[in-house]
Amino acid sequence: MAKEKFERSKPHVNIGTIGHVDHGKTTLTAAITTVLAKKGLSELRSFDSIDNAPEEKERGITINTSHVEYQTANRHYAHVDCPGHADYVKNMVTGAAQMDGAIIVCAATDGPMPQTREHILLARQVNVPRLVVFLNKCDMVDDEEMLELVEMEMRELLSFYDFDGDNTPIIRGSALGALNGVPQWEDKVMELMDAVDTWIPLPPRDIDKPFLMPVEDVFSITGRGTVATGRIEAGIIHVGDEVEILGLGEDKKSVVTGVEMFRKLLDQGEAGDNVGLLLRGIDKNEIKRGMILCKPGQVKAHSKFKAEVYILKKEEGGRHTPFHNKYRPQFYLRTMDCTGEITLPEGTEMVMPGDNVTITVELIYPVALNVGLRFAIREGGRTVGAGQITELLD
């Protein structure tokens, strides 16, 4: 059975467990691996191995996250579970763990709690497309009406935050029961995985999106022209393709006359490849780090956007003091550093280290941006926050 694991023919989806503290997120994660392991689709992970989440650094922010992998009959999943509420906020806002969908765990004994609401809101703001609800601890609730009430509250909460509250699957189960091998509750975990398989959509693959590459470095090859290097973020580039060069004020067009990787010439480069692209008719000083190359007409340069950000605490190496309206740090977008001015939401006087907040940013010059783009906020060479663009305003 163990050989199954390296089979990568199944589509890959990133998911996670979210929800209020002590509602059973980690127990459910352990239960999923345990039940699927019995079917030969996963390696068993104990509660303790998931709960002792290793620290990770993402854009200078320390986050505790556990990564678990398993498969169903149809898909391969990478599953993220975080021990603490602050870890979730950081994880979702900075995109350390991109989620294509999530399982929101709610204890039937408590019903929706403050973090249940907060995680649903965060999922909405960082564009997690769909959620599946797992009502946990149903073995501790005898009253059918109580279960129906909690289910109704969850549907209202989902609808309030623009998820499809009417059709979102809600599974009633017991993570602990499943973990302890009770057949009735094991079946509920399988039912949950079926719901995840069908309700959470397959993410578009980067390779199917239009070509885009942030420029990391530029050099000229005598007699051949200018080469821009970087990692292709999306799409495919062929020799002979026309590209647009965007950012730092003026936009230009060029044709790719060569694609090079590890000093070998290729016919094409695709998402994930680190390549050098030879550009026809472009002078070395016309293109620099921070610009992007993309398929013409796909991306526009913008200077004003709305974003959801997390501001680091002092202990995380962030600011020691709050910042106020019109604060002007650097925004590190892809390979580009650009100064921008922050406008806080109405009624917000200041932002404290450790807060997460929705801000409006105006950059001093237009940069190629898109919704969902993640960035770091820096000041004096250190990261003070991170976030992602939720709306373009110009």
From Swiss-Prot:
Residues 60-64 are annotated as: G2. Mg(2+) binds at T26. It catalyses: GTP + H2O = GDP + phosphate + H(+). Residues 136-139 are annotated as: G4. GTP binds at residues 19-26, 81-85, 136-139. Monomer. This is Elongation factor Tu. The gene is tuf.
